[in-house]
Amino acid sequence: MALVVSVLSVWGQGCCADTVTFAGRIENAEYQVWIEMDFYHNDVVTPGQEIFGQVPGYFGAKRDTRKWIFVDAEVKGKQARLVITNDYGSEDLEARLTLERDGTYTLERLKGSTMKIVVGGKWVNIPKKLTFKRPVATDPTA
């Protein structure tokens, strides 16, 4: 009886809450961009932007040193609502990140500024909707 009560007590405290769906790195190969995130602990430090401290995450690009910083993230099920600002604080937007049934993620701008990156000295607008995937782990011994 005590074991049942103990197990129910732990279960009731949310022992098995999701802490991985919106944590880690996801990538978009077409635009060569990625998202680094931990919406559960809000403990991501943006490289080169340490002045912001720990944040829920950021959007980075392989060909641009600028970052779009996630200043707020609210997770509800398979979706996260985000408040994002550029690293100068001059542009911001609200977006939604959704885990799709096929395991991909969709970032959708809901309102506000269009995200942009620099490629070859020219500004490139990021589409209103963009699909991301988790990177494939490689075996270093292979």
Model-derived segments and spans:
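Bacterial N-terminal signal peptides
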Residues: 1-10
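Central antiparallel beta-sheet cores of small beta-barrel/beta-sandwich binding domains
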Residues: 15-96, 100, 105-142
